[in-house]
Amino acid sequence: MRWVAVSLACLGAVRSAPAVVSGDIYGPGSTQIPLASVPLKGSGDADAPALGARFASILAKDLELSGYFKALDPRSFPERPDTMGLTADTTDFTAWNATGAQDVVKGAITVNGGRVQLEARMFDVPSQVEVSAVGRRFEGSAADVPRMAHRMADTILEYLTGERGPFDSQILFTSRRGGPLKDVYVFDFDGDPPRRLTNERAIVVAPRWHPSGDEFLFVSYRRHLPQLYRQALGSRTARSVVSGRVAILNGAWSPDGSKLLVARDVGGNTDIYLLDSAGKPLRRLTDHWGIDVSPTWAPDGRHFAFCSSRSGSPQIYVMDIDGGGLRRVSFHGSYNTSPAWAPKGDRIAYTTRQNGFQIVVAGADGTGGRLVTRDGVNEDPSWAPDGRYLVFSARRGGRRVLVMTDREGRMQRELTTGQGDDTSPAWSPRRDY
């Protein structure tokens, strides 16, 4: 699929400078922006209108999930796809103002033999102008339409906040929805039906992305021993990372993909080891009687966090990649696990045992920790690529589902239905345009 910006020569009255929103969503005094995502005007093949409606629906869902927007009911729209204009001069701003809409997104889609040309534009209702910085054209196949919607949502959020959104991303997780044992699944950010990636017929845990987003790690007990495997996203074949019968409980690629951190069990003692990308040991980083697991890299590649029982109960520690500079960074109670380092390096999220199990977000040095969940069972946080959101596994009414929240914990959205005990989420890196 190609990403092409709309030429300014095509535009009428426009506004290009964004009114950037500062601070976190749902902060004091914040208001969700009423937005209308109109089904696209379709031409060409018979499925064009349906694809145009799907684009609009996905875009609306993405923007509502962000917490910045409130999508309006399409039944209130005063313009219809087959008759609406696509410029500011042909947009009925008076009618749109009556619906309460502040922004309107509309456009056109042409489908010929499965090939799609799509144009989407955003209009500011109070100013009665088109927002030039947001208009986009896309070319691709019918199957690319969801990604076109995600990229449009990314562009709108970047216009609003100054930072690209997380919408054109994916989430790995483990689930039993395909049978009695868990496998690795993946779905797009908006919760489209998950796609099964593995068929292990064994216990599977701890999926983690390669920084390219093209492959992933996971731990399988297929040989009755936890071992680390890697698999390309488009493949059905996984290969072992470390040769021989070596027990590895979890692993994580470095930000540049050149190294791996793994929790390796040797003689009943689990420590953190540094490997090269081919699985060759480079260095043992921890050497303690306590259990050291769940390594997560800092974005700069010079530090990592992990969970250790060295103090007598699980806590989160940070260490330099050369094995020095050990310091504890978890201070919420006596039981803290599953660290996840934020993409910007300024925060670490982890699970704490408090009124069940809750998610904590703290500074990378452990200061300023706050709960982003309050009750129930909530575990295994993973950061969105923009660092504004997290996904975690939660127990809801006897089901295990994946839930998204902002980093302040002011909103929560369920992303899966819990059909198969959904756990161990891992949010992907950004996908390149």
Residue ranges of each PLM-predicted region?
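Short loop/turn segments that connect beta-strands within beta-propeller blades
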Residues: P126, D188-D192, A232-R236, D276-K280, ...
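A flexible loop/linker signature enriched in serine peptidases of the S9 family
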Residues: R164, S175-D183, N199-A202, V219-L228, ...
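Residue-level detector of Asp-centered blade-edge/turn motifs that repeat once per structural unit
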Residues: G165-F167, P211-S212, P255-D256, P299-D300, ...
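Short beta-strand->alpha-helix linker/helix-N-cap micro-motif
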Residues: Y26-T91, V105, I109-V111
